[in-house]
């Protein structure tokens, strides 16, 4: 699997999965998407049935309307309209830790949705309004406010199977793969490089 950061419209159609990541400035970043031509490319991909995942701010961009008096001076703006869902920002930030390790930290809240939810909540109190599902799932589109949802091995494997199915491709899941074990391995590699190339005694002596 290869992950690429892209900033050109031509690359949007080629990916098996397009991810619109989190953003601390949803409205202004959405304006950049439009100015760069990426918004049109995202809409074309959605119309063609290409899988798209929006996470937090990326999910908010995929919705119909965004009303943000908290982090933006633009007022009510049109989203990409991929979900029939409206977002309103609230001064009180939503802070939730979910049982699978995923978490939410955002001002934007779903105030109306005409599309099916995606992730079943363990407790209706997890979602403002007591909804039984969080996020949206429509066709080849998925959106959630949850960061780290795919760090949970079972969640990720199920999601990647879905992506492969939508794309009509064979994808063999490594059932033994562990996100947390791999993250620890990568952190150990970074620590080894730092220990090898930095004079830690000198650095610590300055503290």
Where are these regions (language model features)?
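Amide-donor transfer/coupling interface in amidating biosynthetic enzymes
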Residues: 1-11, 39-47, 86-207
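Cysteine-nucleophile active-site neighborhood
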Residues: 24-101, 109
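Residue-level signal for inorganic ion chemistry
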Residues: 18, 56, 147
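General beta-strand structural signal in soluble alpha/beta enzymes
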Residues: 5-7, 20, 54-55
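Terminal amphipathic helices with adjacent charged low-complexity linkers/tails
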Residues: 12-20
């Amino acid at each position: 699997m290869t992950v690429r950061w892209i900033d050109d419209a031509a690359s949007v159609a080629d990916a098996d999965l397009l991810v619109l990541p989190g953003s601390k400035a949803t409205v202004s970043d959405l304006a950049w998407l439009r100015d760069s031509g990426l918004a049109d490319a995202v809409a074309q991909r959605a119309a063609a049935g290409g899988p798209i995942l929006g996470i937090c701010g990326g999910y908010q961009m995929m919705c119909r309307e965004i009303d943000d008096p908290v982090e933006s001076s633009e007022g009510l703006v049109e989203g990409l309209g991929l979900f029939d869902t409206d977002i309103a920002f609230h001064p009180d930030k939503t802070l939730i830790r979910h049982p699978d390790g995923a978490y939410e930290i955002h001002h934007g809240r779903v105030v109306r949705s005409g599309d099916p939810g995606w992730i079943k909540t363990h407790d209706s109190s997890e979602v403002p309004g007591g909804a039984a599902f969080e996020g949206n799932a429509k066709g080849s589109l998925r959106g959630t406010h949850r960061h780290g949802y795919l760090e949970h091995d079972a969640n990720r494997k199920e999601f990647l199977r879905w992506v492969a199915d939508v794309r009509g491709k064979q994808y063999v899941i490594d059932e033994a793969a562990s996100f947390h074990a791999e993250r620890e391995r990568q952190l150990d590699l970074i620590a080894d490089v730092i220990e090898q190339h930095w004079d830690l005694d000198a650095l610590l002596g300055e503290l």
